[in-house]
Amino acid sequence: MVLLPLYDVDPLEGKTTPFVTYGLIAINVIVGIAVFSLPADTYKTLLNVIGLVPAIETRELPRLGLFPRDLALFSAMFLHVGWLHLVSNMWFLWIFGDNIEDALGHLRFLVFYILCGLTASAVFVLSAPHLTTPMVGASGAIAGVMAAYLMIRPCTKIEVLAFVWPVAVRAYWVIGIWIALQFVNVGSYADDGIAYWAHIGGAIAGALLIIAMRPPNVALFECMSPPDVGGNTIS
């Protein structure tokens, strides 16, 4: 990504402790440590058993072992293919998740996150029903978090690295560009292995769910100017 988010500068941040966000990050890291320590063959087998294999979900292939077939829609959200994949996903969740948790409350945020992830998994299966390799990662759920952030904090400044320079950019640029790139690149899964349809499905779910689940005091598309931060600003 050309714009690498570092942190957000939110005037409403810090109202509640984001226990669920921290818990989700901790679970993903613990699972990552556990599976990355496995022998390579065992790790590969595990991904095929509890990762999301569309051909298994569509009944083209038999399920492997006793793992419930449709549970992979959920379990795939907590698996990653390496440390870079894990750390980058958790970094985005750490930046954007606390704001959505603060807006929705702890329990509703947990439900929101899981529903975004399940939708992302389902959309990916529909987009590639014959695929025989596993899809794993939290990015579909996190795409939903980012879409919700765009809708309730569109003008919040995000400190990003634009190539090598720190710049404060409005959230609608950072997240808007990221979402647009998912649509631009949606046909390139075979080339880069990135599940763009999962991201799109998660983002659409997040946009719809934040409308349905937000408390009455949480406004949509409301711009509030945060305190000035270092670096240049793009509005």
Residues covered by each model-derived region:
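A detector for small-residue-rich transmembrane helices and their helix-helix packing motifs
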Residues: 1-235
